């Protein structure tokens, strides 16, 4: 039970953090050369910092889980020399040295891995930490995707950084095609959905507006029952019961001990009149596909679409 509790709280914590801006946004990028060569790689990162690289990065530390996934999806995993402590997919990424981020960042550890680029989310470091990295000659690239288009931009920037422009374009195109197909095949609907990101045992939290889940729900013509609240929000059982969703999506993890997250939801007192519970329309997406701004966001959307369409 301790494992379940820790994993669930960790999931809720990291999910909440992904919606919060950090303090590195105003940090300045490493000064580009006054006269960059014709072969230099130049792009603007997600917080409008001008990035110039003489050549594609060959030693990268990716601090966010989404950035790790993007690098793997581009077939460039060999450039990774370290990962953020919360990077967990694909499984082989766990073999890389883990680097703490945020307040617990160990700059000496980062420097010891000798990266030429550190790729981080906007929340990962302070301006002072970014400045220290850049003063050590390390290029810092910031990703800050908060919607689907932002994910596309993050993939494009990472492709540029790695000399994988064509692979990045192909990945973005594939994701765009998935989302376009979902939109084209979606009929007008009055159905509603509730996204549960933390279970009852540890306090109910839901995805509201300005989240990937809400954006994807809108693609499918679904109404998020907590679209009136921005970001990730703590909610009550009474609110969920009153709003009576037609579908419930949970991202709670299960370790094989006790009822599954779906079974636990079905057994909650007073929830038996909720349409999603009455009709057993509960989907578990505990693999971060819908909560992580990476390539698998399209896979999560397709899984949700198939689930809704089969209902």
Predicted regions and their residues:
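Bacterial Sec-exported substrate-binding components of ABC uptake systems
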Residues: 2-7, 18-66, 165-194, 247, ...
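Hydrophobic core
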Residues: 11, 15-16
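Short helix-initiation/N-cap motifs at beta->coil->alpha
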Residues: 46-48, 97-108, 229-237
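A short, structured surface patch at a secondary-structure boundary
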Residues: 59-113, 117-123
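Alpha-helical, coiled-coil/dimerization segments enriched in small aliphatic residues
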Residues: 86-89, 205-232
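A ligand-binding cleft/hinge motif common to bilobed small-molecule-binding domains
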Residues: 124-135, 242, 247-266
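Extracytoplasmic ligand-binding site segments that recognize negatively charged/polar headgroups
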Residues: 126-129, 144-157, 190-212, 256-259
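Structured C-terminal subdomain patch of bacterial secreted/periplasmic proteins
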Residues: 152-153, 160, 169, 173, ...
């Amino acid at each position: 039970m301790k494992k379940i509790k820790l994993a669930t709280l960790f999931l809720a914590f990291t999910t909440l953090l992904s919606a919060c801006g950090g303090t590195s946004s105003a940090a300045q990028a490493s000064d580009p050369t006054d006269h960059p060569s014709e072969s230099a790689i130049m792009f603007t990162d997600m917080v409008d910092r001008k990035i110039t690289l003489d050549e594609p990065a060959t030693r990268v530390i990716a601090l966010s889980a989404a950035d790790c996934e993007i690098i793997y999806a581009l077939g460039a995993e060999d450039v990774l020399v370290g990962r953020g402590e919360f990077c967990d997919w694909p499984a082989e990424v766990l073999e890389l040295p883990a680097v703490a981020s945020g307040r617990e960042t160990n700059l000496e550890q980062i420097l010891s891995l000798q990266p030429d680029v550190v790729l981080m989310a906007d929340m990962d470091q302070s301006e002072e930490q970014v400045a220290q990295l850049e003063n050590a000659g390390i290029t810092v690239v910031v990703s800050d995707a908060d919607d689907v288009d932002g994910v596309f931009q993050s993939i494009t920037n990472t492709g540029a950084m790695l000399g994988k422009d064509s692979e990045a374009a192909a990945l973005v195109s594939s994701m765009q095609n998935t989302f376009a197909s979902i939109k084209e095949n979606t009929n007008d609907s009055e159905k509603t959905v509730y996204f549960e990101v933390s279970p009852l045992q540890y306090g109910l939290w839901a995805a509201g507006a300005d989240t990937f889940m809400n954006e994807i729900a809108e693609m499918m013509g679904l109404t998020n029952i907590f679209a009136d609240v921005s970001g990730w929000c703590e909610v009550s059982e009474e609110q969920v019961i009153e709003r009576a969703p037609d579908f419930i999506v949970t991202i709670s993890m299960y370790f094989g001990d006790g009822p599954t997250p779906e079974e636990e939801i079905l057994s909650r007192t007073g929830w038996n009149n909720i349409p999603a519970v009455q009709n057993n329309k509960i989907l578990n997406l505990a693999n971060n596909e819908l909560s992580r701004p990476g390539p698998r966001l399209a896979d999560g959307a397709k899984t949700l679409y198939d689930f809704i369409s089969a209902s």
